[in-house]
């Protein structure tokens, strides 16, 4: 079970409500907080708000928390502000880490398949993110069965890190 930050933790929400939701979840044993770079509303604001909560009150519990984030949707204009290129995924994660005030996330997901970037580039970028220490684990989100099988095949063929199929 995780607490999702999609539309509940953006700039349009009341900060005290966000804080209370986090603490209620944590006090009831929910330690997985799930975010994405574009969660808000205002893209990135959910990560900023969690970062504030972490800094002010939950930093001593970081080792008990699983923080996940995702990238794959629009974040900035231009050819590298969206989808699944290596440049976009790494830049997005770097910005997410900065917003949350973290050195790493526990899980980083590619949020949706990219029809224009070779799957091998996306999967290798995820592998590189783990190797860099910016994420402990990586995964995919919103991939259908065939896309998941293809991504797994690429990972088994091209990655240097072992993969776990869950």
Tell me the role of every PLM-derived stretch:
Residues 1-65, 131:
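N-terminal binding-site loop/beta-alpha segment at the start of enzyme catalytic domains
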Residues 3, 33, 50, 67, ...:
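Conserved, mostly hydrophobic/aromatic
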Residues 6, 36-38, 70-74, 110-113, ...:
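Active-site beta-loop-alpha junctions enriched in small/polar residues
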Residues 14-25, 85-98:
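Short, acidic/polar
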Residues 45-56, 117-125, 144-156:
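Distinct, well-ordered alpha-helical segments
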Residues 100-115:
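Active-site groove signature of glycoside hydrolases
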Residues 157-163:
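Conserved small/polar residues in nucleotide/adenosyl-binding loops
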């Amino acid at each position: 079970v995780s607490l999702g930050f999609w539309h509940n933790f953006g700039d349009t929400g009341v900060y005290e409500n966000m804080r209370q939701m986090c603490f209620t979840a944590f006090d009831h044993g929910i330690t997985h907080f799930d975010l994405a770079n574009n969660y808000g509303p205002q893209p990135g604001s959910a990560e900023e708000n969690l970062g504030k909560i972490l800094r002010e009150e939950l930093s001593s519990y970081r080792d008990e928390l699983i923080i996940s984030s995702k990238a794959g949707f629009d974040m900035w204009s231009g050819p590298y502000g969206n989808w699944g290129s290596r440049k976009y995924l790494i830049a997005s994660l770097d910005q997410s880490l900065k917003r949350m005030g973290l050195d790493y996330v526990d899980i980083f997901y590619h949020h949706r398949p990219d029809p224009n970037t070779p799957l091998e580039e996306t999967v290798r970028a995820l592998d590189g993110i783990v190797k860099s220490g910016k994420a402990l684990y990586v995964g995919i989100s919103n991939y259908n069965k065939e896309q998941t099988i293809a991504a797994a095949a690429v990972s088994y063929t091209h990655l240097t890190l072992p993969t776990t199929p869950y």
